[in-house]
Amino acid sequence: ILSGLVGSEMCIRDSFHWDYPTGLLDRGGWLHRDSPAWFADYTAAVAQRLGDRIQDWMTLNEPQCFIGLGYGSGIHAPGQKLPVRQQLKMVRNVQLAHGMSVSTLRAVCARMPCIGWAPVGIVWYPHTSKPADIRAARTATMACEKNHLFNNTLWSDPVVLGRVAPEARRAYGKLLPKYSDGDLRIMAQPMDFYGVNIYQGTPVKGGKKGKAQPVPFAPGNPRTAFHWNVTPESLRWGPKFLHERYGLPVFITENGLSNTDWVAEDGRVHDPQRIDFTRRYLRELRKAVGEGVPVKGYFHWSLLDNFEWAEGYKQRFGLIHVDYQTFRRTPKDSYYWYRDVIRRRGQGI
């Protein structure tokens, strides 16, 4: 399978998508001071086996989720609810693990690696094209709030810019663990792209003193089966603001729609909502490209209906329908549409 994917230039390695060895979890997991070294050892083992064939690598996927939801709200495994101070210690260890993983890949891979990571993109986008709204959206996109970890700059400033974000210092204050100069040097290994998972955003307008004011969604605003608001603009402004901040090419590592899909009497799966969703989002991404954002690529989530960590098999994200009783796979209408989009290299969307 790997050789076939490599031959088709469709191979990118996601090194960590949340499954964590129980033995290491029992020793403290991401709270343990040696957890970055454990991850570097794992990276070395994988790179020794696959580094001659895989060129593109992501170190960690959605760290806001596996820490914030796994150890903050407890919605995801391992289902713990820890104080923010302890979660922030985990953040630092995750950032160290990322940096050590990047260094390991560059040292071990036989093929020159192209490396990034893939945090969640927290996007606030301007309600109108007014400069005040754009400024407010940019500021909100980079902001941090003290009660949770779902933001951009707490995570990415140390690994890209080699500093603790000013927004994080203001929000968390004394709750932040110490970041030594040596820590920041380890974290801020050169990356080749900034991966980001974007599904939705929040519209804002400029309020008093430039403060961002969220704009309520109109009644009946389109929502996914996951109850996420459909906001195509987020795929324009998110990459734009993140590129302004970090200066790296952007890779959309996840974007897609959870929909209510089933096999119709004609044996097909008709999902016009997914086609419309993807078309609208890709059009906005094209606007970002036209405005100078170097977009390296786009991954649709997902190829197959899949298992979601907290939702199980309730949410169907796939371009291919999976019958979970028989495991029969049925390409949806969106599968054929997206295939043609790829063949046309995005022309005509």
What are these regions (language model features)?
Residues 14, 46, 57, 98, ...:
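Conserved, mostly hydrophobic/aromatic
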Residues 19-36, 68-85, 129-134, 261-270, ...:
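Surface-exposed, active-site-proximal loop segments in enzymatic domains
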Residues 16-27, 47-81, 114-122, 296:
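Active-site groove signature of glycoside hydrolases
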